[in-house]
């Protein structure tokens, strides 16, 4: 099905251009991830494999952190800024609430505010992360660790983050899929060969002949787990809850009844990306505070709460995923606007009063769907982390669930967008033919 869809897509010039443009932008991003920041010994980071937040940062940055490239921050600051702006729209700042109701004009203002906030966050985060890794590497990361060097590295990483954000926006506007998700998707896909190599070396290299059976069983269970995650994720991402809709006024040729489809997991994979981004950056800051010798109780507590290799950290990560799932579900689908749009189009849900009654019905339904979505996302992301801690597995396995979730969800969304565009073109072409 995928290859047939791709073949059909490449037959249409406009669709082909969009696909090739997306691939081109991803290639530009991948080239940028190979350019190491000047004055930094990136090989030192290979000695920090056991630092959990480094692996999380690498995931969110699209695998650009491993060699401390100019794109090392990736879209992480933009993601954090987006969360801040969306929170400010929830009756926290009147100006942001007002912009949220101004349609396209307000959206442009909110996007501008997001960019300014992400610029500040990127600069602070870049200096914090550089100082963290320099301290953890026993002062070997930065060649000349002075104020001027840190400011220069901060400026380079901030500029790189802004470029990556711009590349993501180009994909969203002119290519296919969500730009932020596609950037992270590309980074994860590029790291798959390295993940496979790491798992192979741990399972088979320098293993005694008597332990070979255990290694084969381990790899077999791992492959089975991957297949289960792929099937389960594909099923949930494509599952829909259909709300029956009826119309009071039937236009000529219009159906008397229809349905409103809602995804079983309306938030998609965004809550996991949000939670990963929120967890990784503060963990780096607290790590450097601790490494500098400031080991107050609250610092140790904060480290435990944000590190995904501690029970408290895993619980916090799961809680963040749950909270962001509920939050982003209501960002994606506004019950008030849905009720208003149904009423304007002369549609209603059988057994539910239009207006306020429909809004309350949608709110209850979205809470139930968000509950299902949070359990699903939590299961896929947390179980591999627990398996790592219980069986002494690598971080490649621990973050494998999150990586697979992002790959599959982004792939499905891209295919749906492509399929929808082809269907729309076919429908428009048919209408043009019938009117001639």
Task: Locate each region found by the language model.
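N-terminal cationic and glycine-rich segments that engage phosphates or anionic surfaces
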Residues: 1-98, 105-436
